[in-house]
Amino acid sequence: MIVAARIFAVGGLTSFRALFYWLTPWIYVPTMLVAPIFQILLFAYIGRSAGLESDEFYLIGNALQYASIPCLFAMAQMVGGERYQNTLSAILVSPAPRIPLFFGRSLPVLLNGAFVAAFSLLVGALVLGVHLPASSLAPLGLVVLIAAYSCTGLGLINAAASLRIRENAVLSNVIFGFLLIFTGANVPLDAVPKWMSTAAQGMPFTHAIAAARQLAAGASLGDVRGLLGAELLVGAIYGVAGYALLRWFEVQSRRYATLERS
């Protein structure tokens, strides 16, 4: 139990720190802290000029949705990067239990995604002059954490795909685009075709964004518990599927004695 806990905590943190091994950590600021603010401003001003939704609508949608950048790219890089640096094979031949090994790498990503979303939400609100009720801040923090958890589950699937795709950044960008369009971040789900709104129910962020907007409008945490439960379920399904894919690809790699099957 102690060994598993150490693998979960120390292994995950070490792997996350390795993301910045070759790059100066200062790249974190424009990528994770500045870019989401400009995304929020872009859609907010488009909405203003077109007379569509309020600044609050675009603020909440884009702040939460931008958590997909750290969640998708970091999870893929943790596996794909170790594969590229030839350390993944040494990890996979170790007797370490796989659940703490893989999910331990997810925890720093989850926390980072939640931080990016929370930072974007607060700074974006200050820039746009959006008032968020003080009573909604703590519930919104919980929603942000759940949203990051849900997308980290999808990121685990993305990480598994990096064992078969050489340039996973392309796939990560495609998934980011789908989440931007389908989750209601910028277009209300009742304004899109039925099949899109149906598909959105199985995607990260959809329920979290809806819950956050209700909380900002004055709803209580109890009023959105159904939406939060749905978001947790979506994240759990993606997480289990991602872990299963990683294990299956590991078995295939052992069978063919190589990780290079892409």
Q: What kind of region is each of these model predictions?
A:
Residues 1-262:
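Hydrophobic transmembrane alpha-helices and immediately adjacent juxtamembrane helices
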